[in-house]
Amino acid sequence: MAKWTINDSSKIYNIDNWGAELFSINKKGNVCVHPSPNSKYSIDLKVLVDDLIKRKIKPPILLRFMNILEGRIASISRVFKNAISDNNYPAKYQTFYPIKVNQQRQVVEAIANFGKKYNIGLEVGSKPELVAAISMSTGNNLPILCNGYKDTEFIETVLFATRVGYDITIVVEKLFELEKIVEVSKRTGIVPKLGIRVKLSSKGIGKWSTSGGDDAKFGLRISELIAAIEMLKQNDMLDSVKLLHFHVGSQITKIDKIKNALIEGTRIYAEMRKLGVNLEFLDIGGGLGVDYDGSKSSYFSSVNYSLEEYANDVIYQVKNICDDAGVPCPNIISESGRATVAHYSVLVTDVLNNNTQTLMPDFESILTESEKLSPTVKKLVDIYKSIDKHSLREDYHDTIQLIQESVSLFNLGYLNMAERANAEWICSKIIRKINSIVEKMKPIPDELQNFQLSLRQTYFANFSLFQSIPDSWAIDQLFPIVPIQRLDEKPDVLTSIADITCDSDGEITSFVGENGRTKALPLHKIKVDEQYYIGFFLIGAYQEILGDMHNLFGDTNAVHITFNKKTNYKIDTVITGDATWESLKYVQYDSQEILKRVRNNLEKDVSLQKVSIEESSHFLELLDKTLQSYTYLGE
């Protein structure tokens, strides 16, 4: 058999297809991160994590690669610039980052700084996001778009921000909202910059398809759009409308759905121009997807188009319809948050070593002394001895039947616990023996293709699924998971990944594989005393902000890293993860009050001689140390 290579590992984890040329495997068998596609510079993830641990930064660690963030902004801007040139498009393109995708200050700040030369803007949907965007725009002159529902306070804040020099556009979502805007504008004497969101009949596809279509949550129907135009005319505010916006959903997997929305949305733009609305911008919303599984398909974790194809279709469709309708082409805006930030962060954590010295039954003695076994267990031994490639199906089915029979006999009291344990042990041996034969078969019989799941072992990783990758639990989103080391060795254990929460839902059983979605993740058998790390990739969009504190596992340690040609990498920022006292504070516990209550109770016990002073003091020290410690597992 040929020696396992890093190319084999790249295939089974599909790195070349989902990695966007930002991730690779080096000759040491470690995962590397590149600042931009095809860059000759790289950071060895295993070396980086080892260095961070030497700095007392413990896993789980969220690694944020800021150069990738800059590169994604540049890539999106570049493909639109090329599409504009190729199609002789007479207007401009501008990207807006929807900060709901990842509101972390350092992330938004980096996007604001990187995006200056690309005239990037920020999109907000709430008062806290508005305030955050205003703070980031200060000194940077970043334009801001306001979507979502707005109350009077929100509208007043925007209008006075406009008065003092901020470039902010209010996007009207509902007719009653427009009435409020008109009222506040008249009362303050400040004319707003307005956009209108239209509700398209066209829909996206996948888990967010309801963002578009006639039943969408946001936007004006065509009849309401006509009414809005009339209201603006009556209040002499029609000239304040400069933008038309539509959005048909996040992570649109099929390019034809995007084309349909572009055609309908641009037709509405053209008709509004003919009605005398001097629109200057067409905001096509989000939807630009990320190929999480690398299949380049219309599956919900993938996309069947490239970044270049997306940009070309946007520019071509808008120009074609505007030329046909005889109206000026608009400046185009997109809100591609997911595609901007998904790739830039990686969560790395340790797998808890499952190597134990647990004594298992002496298999050889079971085989040689089978006459002492119960009839059910003896039948399993006979199957093990006689397995060959000609009887695989029958042997597999008989084994499953006998293991079920052993459970029934145990429940009825006819099989003791030792005999049931022997049945389980022999069953696992049979499955492994069958697997060793199946692996060599071409093709694998249909009935045996799924049986390998019975070999799947649960590997426990030091993280909270609900905190770090909640979409995996909530919507069955696929994220690439790869060991960051030993990729020059064949991974010989089929696994599922369980977190350390006390919840059965805290387990991942669907993974990115060589041929798309797979139900088991190949990992290595962990060596004694080995620190074995796995990385969760493409988690930069939504995961950090949607994460919750199940079991009070808090934010992880986070490290901002930039590439450095001299030292390979530079640590810009370290954000310490939540300590136990911080997680408790979220749910209204005060650490000092906890210590006070426990101390008072211990003093009573000391006075009654139930515990010694030394025991009381030692316990308080341990409790205080626990309050100051990371919420995740240590040694």
From Swiss-Prot:
Its cofactor is Mg(2+); pyridoxal 5'-phosphate. Keywords: Decarboxylase, Lyase, Magnesium, Metal-binding, Polyamine biosynthesis, Pyridoxal phosphate, Spermidine biosynthesis. It catalyses: L-arginine + H(+) = agmatine + CO2. Its EC number is 4.1.1.19. InterPro entries: Ala_racemase/Decarboxylase_C, Arg_decarb_HB, Arg_decarbox_C, Arg_decrbxlase, De-COase2_CS, De-COase2_N, De-COase2_pyr-phos_BS, Orn/DAP/Arg_de-COase. One of its GO terms (molecular function) is metal ion binding. Catalyzes the biosynthesis of agmatine from arginine. SUPFAM superfamilies: Alanine racemase C-terminal domain-like, PLP-binding barrel. Substrate binds at L282, D283, I284, G285, G286, G287, L288, G289, V290, D291, Y292. Belongs to the Orn/Lys/Arg decarboxylase class-II family. SpeA subfamily. It comes from the Bacteria. Coiled coil: none annotated. GO terms for biological process: arginine catabolic process; putrescine biosynthetic process from arginine; spermidine biosynthetic process. This is Biosynthetic arginine decarboxylase. NCBIfam families: PRK05354.1, speA. It comes from Geobacter sp. (strain M21).
